[in-house]
């Protein structure tokens, strides 16, 4: 059958009209009556004709130009409300930066939501782990992993000290220009692999990084593993952003990278299963994967959970350190205050390492970290899907004070990045880097669900204390060694305190953190 251009155009017009009519029929004749019965009212609806396709194009363009978080910021400014319907590619999403609605989704009505498409999008690399599973699978994962993140396990600083000192001595002390962001990723994968496997990738030491581990297809070096993990996460981020179309995003390189990661970790898994720890052996040295073999002998379960924890243990801490280093270089008066507090509390470079408790008690240090996490939360944008009919407590109706009906199957996104910079919550200087805001009375600040840099509710990050401990101790060592941090591209911060950021897993500075550490 031959179809000419005019016929194709007519068919396209009919299809478009059908989709537009379907969306209108659903909203006005199905959604709205059901919402009214429950005493709910819809939030504002924002369409970009036709079918939200123009907004989809703008969103994709912003993502590729490392401007996605600012695109969402401007979008909520256009909404004029903290919760709204947004039409994207024919689908109605609910978007929210309202703390009470986020609290409801993540805590109060936690059982009414799942991760939706995220499981399938991330399965290729991460498998059945705590960050991909929902429901009973997630509960089992959390029960398995929670004991591994007790204070005793995350507060040992000696192994961190070795890698931090290697980074400082080999890469920072010469006064050369470095990309601190790259080195922080090396640092955190070295410390995370030592915590997880008992052996480090040693990417900060080129000689050790080239030592290979035997695998089914030959040697895999720590350096190769780190590169493969980074490469796999790049495409994983694209798959997550593609939403329901995740299956269209794949490349042979992605699957090769996943295979390298799996082979590398399988070496440690089978080694731990084959050589169970005898009583008293290395009793003072905690190794995550070895402890996990006491709970399960399934190698796939151990590998998947280890990969999930590695994702959190490497990238979130590296992002926190990268953004913090940038701000300390761009705001020398803040660095001077921090350095003075560190020397007063912990002494100079040759002093004994601080304890976990001492790090938490250094108020200036913790204020700096809190402020960076406010401006750059670890997961700035997140998604959920309703698995039962449920409601949000506020945001509906003409005044935004009525409940909102959230039907089963409804997709929701919440923008932590936008919420934690919102002037209505944090005041007129909400986009400014001002660590001393945390000295103000708590009631004068946002409280509770206004600030969730590690997410919240039952799915709050298990490795939160590990990340904060490593970041805190790294900053202490930098302050002990260097009088000044010189950032070589301070102009990337605009009047809105916006840095070009790559929205990946997690977000990072798109231009790196080009830095010189001055002794």
From Swiss-Prot:
Its EC number is 1.14.14.-. It is found in: Membrane. Keywords: Heme, Iron, Membrane, Metal-binding, Monooxygenase, Oxidoreductase, Transmembrane, Transmembrane helix. SUPFAM superfamilies: Cytochrome P450. InterPro entries: Cyt_P450, Cyt_P450_CS, Cyt_P450_E_CYP52_ascomycetes, Cyt_P450_E_CYP52_fungi, Cyt_P450_E_grp-II, Cyt_P450_sf. GO terms for cellular component: membrane. It comes from the Eukaryota. The chain crosses the membrane at residues 10-30, 44-64. Its main location: membrane. It holds the Pfam family p450. The keyword Heme applies. GO terms for molecular function: heme binding; iron ion binding; oxidoreductase activity, acting on paired donors, with incorporation or reduction of molecular oxygen, reduced flavin or flavoprotein as one donor, and incorporation of one atom of oxygen. Its cofactor is heme. Heme binds at residue 461. It is a multi-pass membrane protein. CDD domains: CYP52. Together with an NADPH cytochrome P450 the enzyme system catalyzes the terminal hydroxylation as the first step in the assimilation of alkanes and fatty acids. Belongs to the cytochrome P450 family. This is Cytochrome P450 52E2. It comes from Candida apicola. The lineage of its organism: Eukaryota, Fungi, Dikarya, Ascomycota, Saccharomycotina.
């Amino acid at each position: 059958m031959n179809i000419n251009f005019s016929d194709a155009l007519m068919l396209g017009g009919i299809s478009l009209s059908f989709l537009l009519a379907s969306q209108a029929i659903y909203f006005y004749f199905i959604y709205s009556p059901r919402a009214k019965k429950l005493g709910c009212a819809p939030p504002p609806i924002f369409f970009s004709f036709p079918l939200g396709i123009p907004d989809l194009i703008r969103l994709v363009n912003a993502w590729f130009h490392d401007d996605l978080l600012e695109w969402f910021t401007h979008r909520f400014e256009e909404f004029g409300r903290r919760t709204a319907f947004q039409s994207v590619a024919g689908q109605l999403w609910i978007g929210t930066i309202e703390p009470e609605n986020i609290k409801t989704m993540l805590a109060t009505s936690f059982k009414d939501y799942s991760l939706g498409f995220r499981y399938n999008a991330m399965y290729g690399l991460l498998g059945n782990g705590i960050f991909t599973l929902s429901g009973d699978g997630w509960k089992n994962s959390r029960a398995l992993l929670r004991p591994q993140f007790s204070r005793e396990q995350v507060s040992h600083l000696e192994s961190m000290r070795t890698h931090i000192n290697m980074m400082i001595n080999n890469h920072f002390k010469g006064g050369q220009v470095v990309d601190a962001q790259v080195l922080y990723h090396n640092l955190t994968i070295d410390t995370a692999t030592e915590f997880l496997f008992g052996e480090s990738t040693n990417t900060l030491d080129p000689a050790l990084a080239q030592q290979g581990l035997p695998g089914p297809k030959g040697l895999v070096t720590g350096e190769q593993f780190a590169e493969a993990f980074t490469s796999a996460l790049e495409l994983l981020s694209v798959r997550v952003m593609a939403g329901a179309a995740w299956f269209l995003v794949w490349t042979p390189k992605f699957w090769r990278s996943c295979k390298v990661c799996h082979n590398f970790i399988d070496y440690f898994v089978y080694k731990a299963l084959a050589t169970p720890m005898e009583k008293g052996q290395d009793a003072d040295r905690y190794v995550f994967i070895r402890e996990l073999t006491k709970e399960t002998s399934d190698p796939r379960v151990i590998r998947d959970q280890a990969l999930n924890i590695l994702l959190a243990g490497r990238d979130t801490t590296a992002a926190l350190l990268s953004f913090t280093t940038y701000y300390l270089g761009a705001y020398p008066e803040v660095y001077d205050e921090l350095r003075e507090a560190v020397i007063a509390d912990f002494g100079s470079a040759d002093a004994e390492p601080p304890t976990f408790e001492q790090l938490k008690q250094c108020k200036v240090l913790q204020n700096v970290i809190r402020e960076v996490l406010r401006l750059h939360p670890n997961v700035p944008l997140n998604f959920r899907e309703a698995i039962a009919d449920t409601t949000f407590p506020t945001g509906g109706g003409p005044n935004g004070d009525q409940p909102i009906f959230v039907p089963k199957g409804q997709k929701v996104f919440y923008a932590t990045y936008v919420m934690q910079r919102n002037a209505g919550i944090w005041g007129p200087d909400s986009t400014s880097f001002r660590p001393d805001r945390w000295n103000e009375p708590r009631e004068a600040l946002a409280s509770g669900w206004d600030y969730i840099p590690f997410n919240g509710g039952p799915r709050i990050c298990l490795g939160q204390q590990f990340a904060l401990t490593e970041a805190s101790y790294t900053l202490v060592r930098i302050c002990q060694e260097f009088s000044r941090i010189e950032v070589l591209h301070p102009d990337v911060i605009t009047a809105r305190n916006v840095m070009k950021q790559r929205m990946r897993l997690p977000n990072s500075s798109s231009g790196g953190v080009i830095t010189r550490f001055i002794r």
